[in-house]
From Swiss-Prot:
Record-level GO cellular component terms: cytoplasm
Localisation per UniProt entry: Cytoplasm
Annotated S-S bridges: none
UniProt pathway annotation: Amino-acid biosynthesis; S-adenosyl-L-methionine biosynthesis; S-adenosyl-L-methionine from L-methionine: step 1/1
Identification of the protein by name: S-adenosylmethionine synthase
GO terms classed as biological process: one-carbon metabolic process; S-adenosylmethionine biosynthetic process
Gene3D superfamilies: 3.30.300.10
Enzyme class: transferase
One Pfam family, short name: S-AdoMet_synt_C
Amino acid sequence: MARRLFTSESVTEGHPDKIADQISDAVLDAIFEKDPLARVACETLVTTGLVLVAGEITTDCYVDIPRVARETIREIGYTRAKYGFDCDTCAVITSIDEQSSDIAQGVDRALEVRERYGNEDELEATGAGDQGMMFGYATTETPELMPLPISLAHRLARRLAEVRKSRLLPYLRPDGKTQVTVEYENGRPVRVDTIVISTQHHPRVTLDEIRSGVLEHVVKPVVPPEFLDGSTRFFVNPTGRFVIGGPQGDTGLTGRKIIVDTYGGMARHGGGSFSGKDPTKVDRSASYAARYVAKNIVAAGLAEKCEFQVAYAIGVAHPVSMMVDTFGTGRVDEQTLVKLVKEHFDLRPAAIIKELDLRRPIYRQVSVYGHFGRNDLDLPWERTDKAEALRRGAGL
């Protein structure tokens, strides 16, 4: 029997990098509420007493970015100076330019239109906002077709926030991290080997109180008991103290949790982050589309695991390459799957935006606890509406 361990991590909404992601996506949502055609690339830095929002934004609407930043920080829970960060007293600095005209011309009129070898329809006219490769992944390990380690890590992180905000564990503060190690046997998850939870807390609570509270009210409600046994290891605040947290403890930046945002390291990653980017940026939109493709292939029963790669050239509408890897679990060959993808999915940027209805203020909600496998949200890239057509196309 082949056994191996695989580990994934998540972070809470109060983690400094996630504060930055949430502010960037809150700004994007605020702009999209007024101008769905805006071009947005919004980056955020948070540190002790300071928020810096910078980027390239092209829009005719006005958004009060400092107000958006403060409200986001307030909702996360940094509402008092003794937490090390305060939504009302921190400084908020903005530095915003318009999108580069050199980039804009390639997005506004794709190479296919400029050189007149493409159609003059609206879906052909929009070029990719950058070069790069994006990956999507799906697996039968969980009902949401996500890897079990990242699924459990996200659920533990979300539960930490829930018990803090409901005051079930009133001594918790916003910053926190989770990590789950799952043991696999012949490619199937069989048990949880290790759980690590680090959570910011009130200075006068004891470590024993934190450990017992977290195990009882965070771990037990989240991790299925059949995955726990007498050998499962639990590490709760293993440094012994986590009072200084959030931006006071670490500087946070947009886009530094790309593995947390996706598949917990189980799949490859093209390197591009999501938050603060409008959907003409294929780092975001094509990653969502790639998940849509991979999930439908797995939902169709064509493979137990599927990784899909798509790649683009800046200013060009059509992808330059596509690749499917089923890791030996496919019921049809991978070349056939690529052919089926080309038949059933239009992966030009404008087509992705239209198919997934991405010019809406839907991004703040996915800026924490993962962009994929979110059964708590109605996300278009999580639909499996093309599974039956793929199954028929494969002759199954």
